[in-house]
Curated annotation (Swiss-Prot):
Biological source species: Streptomyces peucetius
Entry-linked PROSITE patterns: ABC_TM2
Cytoplasmic topological intervals: 1-53, 107-119, 160-169, 219-241, 281-283
Subunit structure and binding partners: The complex is composed of two ATP-binding proteins (DrrA) and two transmembrane proteins (DrrB).
Molecular functions per Gene Ontology: ABC-type transporter activity
Entry-linked Pfam families: ABC2_membrane
Protein name as it appears in the record: Daunorubicin/doxorubicin resistance ABC transporter permease protein DrrB
Keyword match Transmembrane helix: yes
Any one GO biological process: response to antibiotic
UniProt KW Calcium keyword: no
UniProt keyword annotations, A-Z: Antibiotic resistance, Cell membrane, Membrane, Transmembrane, Transmembrane helix, Transport
Main location: membrane
Length: 283
């Protein structure tokens, strides 16, 4: 059965009518920088819902390190495992946060290779929101890792002489520190050729920094040349600030130094990452 030309003409709107239909009503306002950032923050948080397996790494890895070093090596590093726990728990919180920052680079690089990056570049919103929202979403990872690690430490016998405020203060300082470090791996995620390169390179950089710090043992037990590296390592200052806050002996110097280092990392790597992101070859 065929349709007559007259019927086609009567059901096909003319160009003027089509423009009227499409232009009816007000267009939505362009997203502000804040709303665009919050949207990408929500997108990052939804990753936990759709990929809950990542919670295994976030929760289990710090707990495994805490149990392993406390009960396998604690007696050798200190007079007893209980004494070593008082030293190591504030340090392992630094390790937990810093290890989570690698997810920033791998998730960003995955978006680039899946084409999500190209789609975002064509949309009319504040482009830095893509990075800022993702990095703010990673704060949830830090909170989960810190909360579970500290909770287990308290169950094992850790004494937080700084009280609740000291523990919360240490967690806030480490969240700021982790946020600043995540910009480094965000820059790496933009330039890396594949997600595996991001994680591989990150481990090569992170493990020497973590182990050549005062997270695991006192610097006095190390050779002189290594002590100089430990003293200059930002991980050491973060661990010291965490210990002082949790044990109620915090001074301005170490906490202020960690915050200054964090501000410096953001000041350097945030603009660099944005520049690399804008100039990224769409191919």
């Amino acid at each position: 059965m065929t349709t007559s030309p007259g019927t086609v003409e009567s059901t096909t709107p003319v160009s003027g009518q089509l423009r009227t239909v499409l232009s009816a009503g007000e267009r939505p306002a362009r997203a502000t920088a804040v709303s665009a950032t919050l949207t990408h923050l929500w997108r990052a948080m939804m990753a936990f819902k759709h990929f809950p397996v990542q919670l295994i790494d976030i929760v289990l890895m710090p707990l495994i390190f805490l149990l392993m070093f406390t009960y396998l090596f604690g007696g050798a590093f200190a007079d007893s495992t209980e004494e070593y726990l008082q030293f190591y728990l504030p340090g392992v919180t630094v390790q937990a946060v810093v290890m989570m920052t690698v997810y920033t680079g791998t998730s960003l690089n995955t978006d680039i290779h899946k084409g999500v990056f190209d789609r975002f570049r064509t949309l009319p919103f504040w482009q830095p929101a893509t990075l800022a929202g993702s990095l703010l979403g990673d704060v949830l990872r830090y909170v989960v890792a810190l909360a579970t690690t500290v909770s287990l430490g308290l169950l094992l016998g850790f004494r937080a002489d700084g009280g609740f405020l000291g523990v919360v203060g240490a967690m806030l300082v480490l969240i700021v520190f982790g946020f600043s470090v995540s910009w480094i791996f965000a820059a790496l995620g933009v330039v890396a050729s594949e997600p595996e390169r991001v994680s591989g390179t990150s481990m090569i950089v992170l493990y020497p920094l973590l182990f050549m710090s005062n997270i695991f043992v006192m610097p006095e037990t190390m050779p002189g040349w290594m002590q100089a590296i430990v003293d200059a390592n930002p991980m050491s200052h973060a661990a010291t600030a965490s210990r002082e806050l949790m044990h109620g002996t915090a001074g301005f110097w170490d906490v202020g130094l960690v915050l200054c280092v964090s501000a410096g990392l953001v000041a350097v790597f945030a603009p660099l990452t944005m520049r690399l992101y804008r100039n990224k070859n769409a191919h």
